[in-house]
C-alpha cells in the first residue's frame, strides 16, 4: 500500500518524532511504499497565500505546493502524527489541509457552489496519532473529541468519504513514563501491522 506519513511537531527529539519513527519503521517492515513529510523540517509554509485564495474558485494556484499535492494524490493511506494544542492541530498541519486539500485536488465545488464533490477516491485509510497534555476525560466528555470530529466530519466525509479513520490519542503525555512511551509504540505497531 502507498503510505504518506505526515509529521507535525517542532521539536526533535519529541514524543511525536519517536512515534513517527516507530510508524515509519513498522510500515517499511511490512513492505508498504512510504513517503514521509515532516512539515517543520521541510519548512512548509502554512498560511494560504493571497494568490492561492484569489484562485480558489477558478483553478487553484498550486505552484508552491505541487510536491505536497503529488504526495496527497499518490497516497492510499495517510498517517498523521501531531500534538493536539488547545484541542486543535498545530497551525502547520491546519495549513497543510488549507493549502493542499484544495478545490480541483481534494474536492470540487458544485456549479452553484453548493455541495462539495469528493475527489480523493484513491484514499482508503487515514490514521491519526495525536498526543495531548490533558487527561482523556477532558477530550472525550467535555469537548467531545474536536480534532477527531473535524477530521472525520468536515475533511474526510467531504473529500474522501470512502476512507476509514483510525484515531489514536495519547493523554497526559508530559508526564508519561518510559513504559507509557513503550506501550504507545507497541499500540501503533500493532495497529499499523494490520493495515
Outline where the language-model segments fall.
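N-terminal beta1-alpha1-beta2 submodule of the flavodoxin-like/Rossmannoid cofactor-binding fold
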Residues: 1-105, 181-195
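A structural motif corresponding to the C-terminal end of an alpha-helix
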Residues: 30, 75, 81, 122, ...
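Residue-level recognition of the N-termini of beta-strands and the immediately preceding loop/turn
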Residues: 34-35, 123-125, 163-166
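Active-site donor-binding loop signature of nucleotide-sugar glycosyltransferases
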Residues: 39, 84, 131, 170-172
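Short, basic/glycine-rich phosphate-binding loops at helix/coil junctions
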Residues: 43-51, 127-133, 165-167
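Short, structured loop/turn "capping" segments at alpha-beta junctions
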Residues: 103-108, 161-165
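Short, glycine-/small-residue-rich phosphate/pyrophosphate-handling segment
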Residues: 109-155
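Glycine-rich phosphate/pyrophosphate-binding loop and the adjoining helix
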Residues: 138-195
Amino acid at each position: 500500500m502507498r503510505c504518506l506519513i505526515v509529521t507535525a511537531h517542532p521539536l526533535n527529539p519529541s514524543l511525536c518524532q519517536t512515534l513517527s519513527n516507530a510508524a515509519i519503521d513498522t510500515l517499511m517492515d511490512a513492505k508498504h511504499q512510504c513517503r514521509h513529510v515532516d512539515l517543520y523540517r521541510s519548512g512548509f509554509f502554512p498560511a494560504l497565500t493571497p494568490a492561492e485564495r484569489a484562485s480558489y474558485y477558478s483553478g487553484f494556484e498550486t505552484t508552491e505546493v505541487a510536491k505536497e499535492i503529488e504526495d496527497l494524490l499518490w497516497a492510499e493511506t495517510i498517517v498523521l502524527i501531531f500534538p493536539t494544542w488547545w484541542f486543535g492541530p498545530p497551525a502547520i498541519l491546519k495549513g497543510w489541509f488549507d493549502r493542499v486539500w484544495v478545490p480541483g485536488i481534494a474536492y470540487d465545488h458544485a456549479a452553484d457552489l453548493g455541495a462539495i464533490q469528493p475527489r480523493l477516491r484513491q484514499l482508503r485509510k487515514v490514521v491519526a496519532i495525536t498526543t495531548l497534555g490533558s487527561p482523556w476525560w477532558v477530550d472525550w466528555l467535555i469537548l467531545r473529541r474536536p480534532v477527531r470530529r473535524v477530521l472525520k466530519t468536515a475533511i474526510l466525509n467531504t473529500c474522501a468519504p470512502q476512507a476509514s479513520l483510525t484515531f489514536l490519542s495519547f493523554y497526559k503525555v508530559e508526564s508519561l513514563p518510559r513504559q507509557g512511551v513503550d506501550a504507545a509504540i507497541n499500540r501503533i505497531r500493532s495497529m499499523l501491522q494490520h493495515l
